[in-house]
UniProtKB/Swiss-Prot annotation:
It catalyses: RNA(n) + a ribonucleoside 5'-triphosphate = RNA(n+1) + diphosphate. Its EC number is 2.7.7.6. This is DNA-directed RNA polymerase subunit gamma. Mg(2+) binds at D471, D473, D475. The keyword Magnesium applies. PANTHER family: DNA-DIRECTED RNA POLYMERASE, DNA-DIRECTED RNA POLYMERASE SUBUNIT BETA. One of its GO terms (molecular function) is zinc ion binding.
Amino acid sequence: MTNSNLRTENHFDYVKISIASPQRIMDWGQRTLPNGQVVGEVTKPETINYRTLKPEMDGLFCEKIFGPSKDWECHCGKYKRVRHRGIVCERCGVEVTESRVRRHRMGYIKLAAPVSHVWYLKGIPSYVAILLDIPLRDVEQIVYFNCYVVLDPGDHKELKYKQLLTEDEWLEIEDEIYAEDSTIENEPFVGIGAEALKQLLEDLDLHQIAEELREEITNSKGQKRAKLIKRIRVIDNFIATNAKPEWMVLDAIPVIPPDLRPMVQLDGGRFATSDLNDLYRRVINRNNRLARLQEILAPEIIVRNEKRMLQEAVDALIDNGRRGRTVVGANNRALKSLSDIIEGKQGRFRQNLLGKRVDYSGRSVIVVGPKLKMHQCGLPKEMAIELFQPFVIHRLIRQNIVNNIKAAKKLIQKADDEVMQVLQEVIEGHPILLNRAPTLHRLGIQAFEPKLVGGRAIQLHPLVCPAFNADFDGDQMAVHVPLALEAQTEARMLMLASNNILSPATGEPIVTPSQDMVLGSYYLTALQPNYQKPEFGDNKTTFASLEDVIFAFEDKRLSLHEWIWVRFNGEVEDEDEMLSPQKTKELEDGSRLEIWNLRRDRFGSDNNLISRFVLTTVGRVVMNYTIIDSVSKT
């Protein structure tokens, strides 16, 4: 924990998500002000006063609970400026502090009746139903006030624990219990709604049930065994996390910070507000109405109806549309609940936590760069100057080209030759990472040495395309710059494209030529039947080296598929299937000329090879020369 200039940083080893106890929910929202006053409970559905445009006290934007809406200024305006820091205004009760506390300070709503948490009730699987070993349909009947559940059968012979009773059935049993000739001394006890559910969950002894289930599993088979395993798995999770089953029924609900569900004034004087405020308002209205009905001892049927409506309001707040009718706002649009904010591609986790925008990164369309080496990529100058700006500024100042950062930035905006020269020096040996979404395996991100190119597209070597599953029909790739020296070293050693030849999944080469490369290689080395094979010794078609052939081809004296004789003293794999030459000539100087179908070999008297001329095509010479040249440079 470090504290400097009122900025507090927390360093975490891990984040654990688990079910919260009622006390934990209260602790999130409840605070004791420096004057000893306890605040945190939201009791009013109002948001802001439409005349003063200030938050209403004890409402959803209350400054006493969540902090001031303006930095260092209380609600009534008595205290302004930072010198009053930490003071609680005697008039309005608002603590004088920064307004950004409204991004993390929470409140809570104390519920007049317990409500079931819709995630645990209607989730798949339903944890409440599994724990109680009651079908989900029956649990819903209890929670939404359609059926009573027997909590204690008493002396009644026909009743069993956890048995469901309709309204009419319970009235009949009541008549039986309170009849004059009744023999029942220990009266049965029934419940309805989330209160009954809470009672059932409180009665569970998880350790004892776990032991009984383990014994039962050994003697059971098939579907029954699978059901028991499912139940024991849930129970073991509750035991391992020290969570109590009754926490799945809420006594209080947290109110998230107001700056995470803002209310914004539009140009016409109207207000745009987060859907959560409407959902919270429904909960508070129904909760206050229920508390009032209980206070005036309203008839049970009215109270029960209000409890059901409160349950539905909390369901809509947590997960709108999970059960019953979806709550809609203007234009019949479904209101966005807490679950909608968290889940899915646009949710908090995938959009904001896992998919954060990062500094020193960019993206652009990829095009083929056939002249690049495999470990290189073409980076547009416009992109490079932006990504490597801090390095360029540092070098400009170090080389005394400019005196300060401001001057360096002005010079960079001009993008003159001096800046480009410095940029070239900076990117020399500084690898960058290229990523193509979706990154399905580790080769989806690879390191390359950047080469400055014109235009706005990233140039990519065609051989690395299979690893990225990329093609050049408009695909985009992201660029990331490793900043630390360790990151650069790791990128160069482990992630460089030329070090990732094999697929990590199969172990087979993933860098394989395809399409244009295969077609080009075939065309280059193909033999055209309509070209005549020249006589050996013809000055126009006999060359002393591969280089001479290349020069003649570049001068357009030769076509690509023309037959030629070329001197090449290396090993030759030709199509001659003969074991001995067609003809052997003894020459005047004592040397020997062997005439094969596609080559002429001349040997000295000591049987050493003096020269070898090979009959081939210009295209094959180009192919061989390119490969030999590339291999000799590495």
